[in-house]
Amino acid sequence: MEKQKDNVTSTKEEILCTKKEQNIDMEKFNSIGFLNEFCHKNKYKPPSYTTLNQNGPDHSPTFNIECRIVDYKPNGKFIGSGLSMKEAKKNAAFKTIKELNLLTLNTENKSSFRVVEIIPYIEKEPHEDEGLLCMWNGDCKKIKITLRKKDGSIQKFKSFLLKIEDSVDIDDI
């Protein structure tokens, strides 16, 4: 991960809310659900899964399952394998997502918000503008970000990407 302590964000930051993740934890990522949601949002037929074969001994088989999204990529066939049919299906869905770059497409529901409140989790009470500086200088490990819609209601997201519009060199402050 790049060191970002050289920059401090200005007040023009936006939170670009998305499900995009750079490092995906396979245990926590629901690849089948993500693929179903992708197809539903884009009005494609749901992905189809076909069991191709079962290899190995009966007490420890390996399953191979093919995943296809006919409306999106008619000739695309992505094969996942696993020690159970469930694992093979999940791996086939993940391979489809990865090979088709579905996590980087602009198909997710994205909305821009201005930063309303940033509260760092540190023991001392920060100065009014210290919240953003704290994010970069390592004084805190977590930052609570509250996003509000124009009507004032709080918007919750499972993950988000912080998009920096302007930045300044820390020596200029």
UniProtKB/Swiss-Prot annotation:
Protein name (record): DRBM domain-containing protein 340R
KW Thylakoid (keyword) present: no
Residues annotated as domain DRBM: 30-102
Record bears the keyword RNA-binding: yes
Database matches in InterPro entries: dsRBD_dom (IPR014720), RLC_Component (IPR051247)
GO molecular function annotation: double-stranded RNA binding; siRNA binding
Organism in which the protein naturally occurs: Invertebrate iridescent virus 6
GO CC entries: RISC complex; RISC-loading complex
Highest rank taxon of the organism: Viruses
Pfam families, A to Z: dsrm
GO biological process: regulation of regulatory ncRNA processing; siRNA processing
Entry keyword set: RNA-binding
Ranges that cross the membrane: none
